[in-house]
Amino acid sequence: MNPRGFEVTGAWFQAGGNIISAIGNTRAFIGEENVEDPLVIVGESLQALGNVLQAVAPEHSINNEEDEKETTGQLDESVQEKENKQSDDAKEQKENNIKPMREQGKSLEKTGAEVQALGNISDIIGTILNMEKEQKENDYLIITGNSLQSLGAFLEVVDELRDVPNIQWLEVIGNSIQTLGAGLQAFQGIYNVLKEERMEKENADDQEAANKKEGEKKEVDEQLLGLIGNWVQAIGAVIEAIGETVEPQS
């Protein structure tokens, strides 16, 4: 598979995984909590696979470009000998200036995809451990996972914006939306953990009656925030996948 194939396939795996995770959280929101964790695990696994494919693509792209240059250089060797030496030196200098920038961009894109993949893995581990026994440490893993996904998507936005002559705006918009969506989920997780810690410090006997009334509403509000973030991230992933698909080949 060529580098572009890796990127497009990875983007659609990521989009599909986000949609599956969002469906799992939606079903939990309407009361079907028993199906949430398996769907989230499947969804996050697909996202991780998609991000790995996208992380591999830049490496293949750089290697292919170098191979092409080497082949072209060999074929045109006799022609280049006839060209003016000064012109050759100027071209070489210009190419040497552009190459590090291109490789740096590829490196940032690769880093963003790798960070998102780590976030997916952290989410998977936290969810699996919570299925066995719900603990605060597992929630920290999920918060870390969502935060890493938000950071990784942001790095990919920065990478796209640096490619000034050829900015792919669909990918910029898609990754920006993913940054927001994953950030909302991380915020929800942090809020939940802080609320639990605060309630542990309060006197359970004094607060029991008040918490009984407000607990259900607060829980719904918190779940709704995470659910919105989940679907926002899924929409962003679909937009990014469309952007990758329609992106003109360089």
Regions found by a protein language model. Name each.
Residues 4, 8-10, 30:
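N-terminal ordered "arm"
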Residues 9-26, 42-60, 108-129, 140-161, ...:
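Membrane-active amphipathic alpha-helices enriched in small hydrophobic residues
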Residues 1, 26-37, 58-77, 82-113, ...:
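Extended, hydrophobic alpha-helical membrane-active domains that insert into or remodel lipid bilayers
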